[in-house]
Amino acid sequence: MIRHIAIFLCSLLMCSTTFADSVTSVSLGALLTALNERMLLMKDVAAYKMKHHLPIEDFTREQNVFAEAEEEAKNNGLDPHSITPFIRSLMDASKAIQYRYLAQWRTGSEPSFPIQTLSVTRQRIRQLDNQMLIIISQRLMVGAFSHDDMVWLRAQFNAPNLNESDISNVLAALSLVRRAR
């Protein structure tokens, strides 16, 4: 009888380790996809703002994004205060990308692709932000992001006009995110 219990417990332990590994690999890939897609959308945002002569900086909008992210963080079991640096880093990287596109277009040809409305693009950005918070929360249930996770994310995080400093800031802020107690 004891032997059967020992075998059962060993099997359970192996299954939980396998499950945790699969959650980790799936969540890292999904997180990376959402991060890259979010940054790719900045080209659309920059094009719209250029066409309509809008500033890149929008303090009121940023405050709304923080409030929405903190609420979504709470809903997903994350410490809302720990998510603030991550959201800030995403916004800073996003604005940097927009400025870089504007500089390119002002010295060369303007965008020649169909420009999405800002409301449609912002809706998709919000969906991606919420998706990232869900993924991060699920990932943190099985443990913190490891050094290897961060190395992998850094190697794969590669949207146009995103530089190494932007990537470092986003990943450093990601490592600060915690689950709520």
Swiss-Prot record:
A single GO BP: salicylic acid biosynthetic process
Record-annotated membrane-spanning stretches: none
Alphabetical UniProt keywords: Isomerase, Periplasm, Signal
E.C. number: 5.4.99.5
SUPFAM superfamilies hit by this protein: Chorismate mutase II
Pathway recorded for this protein: Metabolic intermediate biosynthesis; prephenate biosynthesis; prephenate from chorismate: step 1/1
Pfam families, A to Z: CM_2
Cleavable signal peptide: 1-20
Main location: periplasm
CC per GO annotation: periplasmic space
Protein name: Monofunctional chorismate mutase
Source organism per UniProt: Salmonella typhimurium
Taxonomic lineage from the root: Bacteria, Pseudomonadati, Pseudomonadota, Gammaproteobacteria, Enterobacterales
